[in-house]
Amino acid sequence: LDIEYFFTDTGEELDEVYEYLNMLEGYLGKPINYLDPKRDFKFWMTQYNNFLPSAQARWCTVRLKLTPFEKWVDEEFLQKGIKVKSYVAIRSDESFREGLQSKKEIETVLPFKENHIDKQAVFEILENSGLGLPKYYEWRSRSGCTFCFFQRKIEWVGLMERHPEAFENAKRMEKTALDNGSPFTWCQSESLVELSKPE
């Protein structure tokens, strides 16, 4: 297979993500294309009336992940008549996930789902390859940008302890959102200010 690897960089990733991508490039022996959305998270937040993204309004995924990917595929492949298959790492134990659909010219393939590979099997593949798991799995259950709204509360506590500057940045964004009438906080039912108060 002629595979091009890519990473859609939101500009709000944990340092551990970049460390792992560097290791992965060495393992693959091929560069990973970093796709830049051109406009950062804060720009798009202002475009969405300073509302935070949520499970119901995932503008961050569309603007910072899907749109740059589609642009790259269109310019590098589709306009040149090259057919594209996009391999998406949704696992077999994630039956609730379908992934955001991109352009109809891009065929989406879900190899983990198709081959019944669950989270434990993915971890085993990574361990057996010698790569191991990304360091953020020491305290997080999933990948995603620094302040992904899918994080559990304990993961926000982990962010506060391990990356206090990123946690403070997320608090500032949340305050901006709340000051502008956003119905969402990063965590369901409690703000990061409340979460960070000692008990």
Role assignments for model-derived ranges:
Residues L1-E199:
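Nucleotide-activated chemistry modules centered on ATP-dependent adenylation/adenylyltransferase
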